[in-house]
Curated annotation (Swiss-Prot):
Annotated compartments: Cell inner membrane
Annotated protein name in UniProt: Undecaprenyl-diphosphatase
InterPro entries: UppP
EC number: 3.6.1.27
Summary of the function given for this chain in its UniProt record: Catalyzes the dephosphorylation of undecaprenyl diphosphate (UPP). Confers resistance to bacitracin.
Species of the source: Escherichia fergusonii (strain ATCC 35469 / DSM 13698 / CCUG 18766 / IAM 14443 / JCM 21226 / LMG 7866 / NBRC 102419 / NCTC 12128 / CDC 0568-73)
GO biological process: cell wall organization; peptidoglycan biosynthetic process; regulation of cell shape; response to antibiotic
Length: 273
């Protein structure tokens, strides 16, 4: 792969990662399809995907830095105003409770989960995840019990963490699982999305660090320019995607995202089968 071609591939995959990582559409499904079409597969490709995920995570940190600092007791300026009443009740305990179920299962079954990374499993996960989004929209309480982040209870945070375990199934979508779970637990669509983003920071940083440690040997100095382009592209695109998504869900439901997942599942079938 020539230098210019590799940088173009990196930029394309960075855009795909940044656009899809925090939307309920499965970044894994998109990366598998696009990587296959671009002929970028194998151990280097897997390491590259891990690195550009860090770019997406950094975008969340930049977008929610005040809230993240607030969780550890460091406050800047006036209190944050979020969707619903802001009473300053969201704590680090909520985040920890949301992490525990997936962390435990992920550590216990890490190798088994990695073995599920194949097109057919991703295809099925896309469909089931889409059905869950539809179920969440249809079955959610008429009036959310937690309209804002600071109205969430510990129980709701833990149950969202249980739903997050579904995302260990490659292609399911971590944000899709957590947002759907939050809505079914009575958290508003907007607050569930915000909590999903906040929960992503420690969850994805931990998972990415573990994957990077295990795949570091596949990274060479010649890969650095390509990895840097992918990282920066994913960061910039994720910033725009997160901001746009949070504005969009104030006006529309998740049904269009569910339909889109079914289309991507069909695309996986066409490309790989």
């Amino acid at each position: 792969m020539s230098d210019m071609h590799s940088l173009l591939v990196a930029a394309i995959l960075g855009v795909v990662e940044g656009l899809t990582e925090f939307l309920p559409v499965s970044s894994t499904g998109h990366m598998i399809i696009v990587g296959h079409l671009l002929g970028f597969e194998g151990d280097t490709a897997k390491t590259f995907e891990v690195v550009i995920q860090l770019g997406s995570i950094l975008a969340v940190v930049v977008m929610f830095w005040r809230r993240l600092f607030g969780l550890i007791g460091i406050h800047f300026g006036r209190p944050l105003q979020h969707e619903g009443e802001s009473k300053g009740r969201l704590t680090l305990i909520h985040i920890l409770l949301g992490m525990i179920p997936a962390v435990v299962l992920g550590l216990l079954f890490h190798d088994a989960i990695k073995s599920l990374f194949n097109p057919i499993n991703v295809m099925y996960a896309l469909v089931v995840g889409g059905l869950l989004l539809i179920a969440a929209e249809c079955l959610k309480p008429k009036e959310p019990r937690a309209p804002g982040l600071d109205d969430m209870t510990y129980r709701q945070a833990f149950m969202i963490g249980c739903f997050q375990c579904l995302a260990l199934w490659p292609g399911f979508s971590r944000s899709g699982a957590t947002i759907s779970g939050g809505m079914l637990m009575g958290v508003s669509r907007y607050a569930a999305s915000e909590f999903s983003f906040l929960l992503a920071v420690p969850m994805m940083m931990g998972a990415t660090a573990l994957d990077l440690y295990k795949s570091w040997g596949f990274l060479t100095t010649g890969d650095i320019p390509m990895f840097a382009v992918g990282f920066i592209t994913a960061f910039v695109v994720a910033l725009v995607a997160i901001k746009t998504f949070l504005q969009l869900i104030k006006r529309i439901s998740f049904i269009p995202f569910a339909i889109y997942r079914f289309i991507v599942a069909a695309a996986v079938y066409v490309v790989f089968f």
